[in-house]
Amino acid sequence: IHDVRSNVASKSVNLSADIQTLIESVELAVEFNEFYSQGQIAVAEAVLTEAERRVELLASGKQDWHQAQGLVVRGYYSSIDGSAQPYGLEIPADLNSTKAIPLYVWLHGRGDKTTDMHFIHQRMTRAGRIAPSNALVLHPFGRHCMGFKSAGEIDVLECIEHVKQHYNIDTQRIVLMGFAMGGAG
């Protein structure tokens, strides 16, 4: 973590939420001992490797994750407390973004061990349960295991707004869905 932070400082780049969420997720996992097996050290390394890659790209002015296809982790700054909050996107390779596209918002089920770092790694490595054609799938993190109430609800709404600012979303075709706790959201 120190090496990534030092790299950021040496490059004199302003961290976007897209990078800050990655670094902070590992810092939180270390601070609160959120490593539940030996294999999760590799999870932290993968998240930090992506953070370092993004720092290098940002420093060179070549951010690619904004136009990436496939599984993409992004972030935004919360109006609640100013914290960087993560979300995942699934962007089909054949997406026609010249036309307004639907947005499917998938609310995850409860996961007592799904911390920021674990959520980010899942969104970097595993597609979700739905794969609509010519549409984006949004996976908000949504703080707290409370059925997307309170801060979690605001997080979902802010994720949607952030995605609408960066992608050509058809505001008449935004679908909210989920399973278990996500279905209650």
Positions of PLM-derived features:
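Active-site machinery of serine-nucleophile hydrolases
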Residues: T98-Y167
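Residue in the alpha/beta-hydrolase core beta-strand immediately N-terminal to the catalytic nucleophile
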Residues: R173-V175
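A domain-start/cap signature at the N-terminus of enzymes
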Residues: F32-I101
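Sec-exported extracytoplasmic/periplasmic mature domains
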Residues: H2-A9, E27-E31, F35, R53-S60, ...
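Solvent-exposed, polar/charged alpha-helical surfaces in well-ordered, non-transmembrane soluble domains
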Residues: A17, E24, L28, A42, ...
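Solvent-exposed, acidic/flexible segments
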Residues: S12-I19, S37, I41, C145-E153, ...
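Glycine-rich nucleophile elbow surrounding the catalytic serine of serine-hydrolase chemistry
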Residues: G178-G185
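Amphipathic, heptad-repeat alpha-helical segments
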Residues: I1-I23
